[in-house]
Regions:
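Hydrophobic h-region of N-terminal signal peptides that target proteins for export
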Residues: 8-18
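Beta-propeller-forming repeat regions
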Residues: 18-324
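Sec-dependent signal peptide recognition
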Residues: 1-7
């Protein structure tokens, strides 16, 4: 196996706490095309093929790796969708029943999902099917522990009113949409989830989303409590998606200030800076790290010597490592 040991070139960084966070260029064999996680392990695609990522103390190594092998896609699944794996009650879930009834095309084509399929651990499948007034404008359902049990978070878009965030789970023995945020209010208006965690340390789980990441860039925090979604915080100057891209994970969750509470790493509205945000006791910017070009790939969270790190690619094909 060919092994590539990466060299790191320090780049000037504009940060809110310059002594705490750095940005380094990771020299790669060719332009970076894609960052994914496969079985919990990071994989990076460049013009020269696929590489795995290995942390070694204060350094990161890229090792040549075979192309990833994804599980077979069910016949009813969205063609460009991804299968989500559960940990407890659910085996997996996917978006299904492709439809072209909503022509927004923000994710690269006008084919969206008309249904969500959940497969239990024993193999039994349940389908949540939408009416003709809406679609799932998403690529992968997010399985998360909300309120003591696994539930699914997905983007539901109304043909006449735009996107809402939907929480799907079991009610009276059947799967259904348990709650959703109000839709944006106009067609072709979309939102993108950014992270799911207890962001303020109160024991309840919040869902972070960016409302209209291409036109408004408003980050909102919605708490799941007693079967309902309650907006508890919001701020501007964020984005986690580029129009037409299938990269929906341009953000990541980690404890970036060391206080034991989850924080959020997310691009600024122009995607030329990475903002590290804390929500404990109010919204606070831990650091703002300037990028040489707009963020373009999914983010991958790493841990080196007990500290969180972030890998991401930019629109000019470069790979960057953000760390303390």
């Amino acid at each position: 196996m060919l092994r590539l040991v990466c060299a790191f070139v320090l780049v000037a960084a504009s940060v809110a706490r310059a002594d705490a966070w750095k940005i380094e260029t990771v020299e790669t064999p060719g332009a970076v095309r894609e960052l994914i996680e496969l079985g919990g392990e990071p994989r990076i695609a460049t013009a020269s093929g696929w590489f795995s990522v290995v942390t070694d103390g204060a350094r990161v190594r890229l090792e040549k790796a075979p192309p990833p092998r994804f599980p077979p896609i069910p016949t009813d699944a969205l063609p460009d969708g991804r299968i989500a794996a559960g940990k407890r009650e659910f085996a997996r879930a996917w978006l299904a029943e492709p439809t072209n009834r909503y022509g927004h095309g923000v994710l690269g084509d006008t084919i969206e999902a008309g249904a969500l399929v959940v497969e239990r651990k024993g193999g039994r499948r349940e389908t949540v099917r939408l009416g003709n007034d809406s679609v799932f404008e998403d690529l992968e359902p997010r399985i998360a522990d909300l309120g003591g049990g696994e539930k699914i978070v997905a983007v539901k878009s109304y043909l006449a009113a735009g996107s809402a965030l939907a929480v799907i789970g079991e009610r009276d023995g059947q799967f259904a949409i348990l709650a959703e945020t109000p839709p944006i209010g106009a067609p072709n208006r979309w939102l993108n989830p950014a992270g799911i965690a207890d962001f303020d340390g109160d024991g309840a789980v919040e869902i972070a989303l960016v409302r209209m990441p291409h036109a408004l860039g408003r980050l909102e925090l919605w708490r799941w409590s007693a079967g309902k979604l309650l907006k508890v915080a919001e701020t501007g100057d964020t984005s986690n998606h580029a129009i037409g891209s299938r990269n929906l994970d341009q953000s990541t969750v980690g404890d970036f200030d060391g206080d034991g509470v989850a924080d959020l790493a997310i691009p600024s509205f122009d995607r030329r800076s990475i903002r590290l945000l804390s929500f404990r006791g109010g919204i606070r910017e831990i650091a703002r790290i300037k990028l040489p070009a707009p963020a373009a790939t999914n983010f991958i969270a790493l841990a080196s010597q007990g500290s969180p790190e972030i890998l991401l690619g930019t629109a000019d094909g470069k790979l960057f490592r953000l760390h303390r």
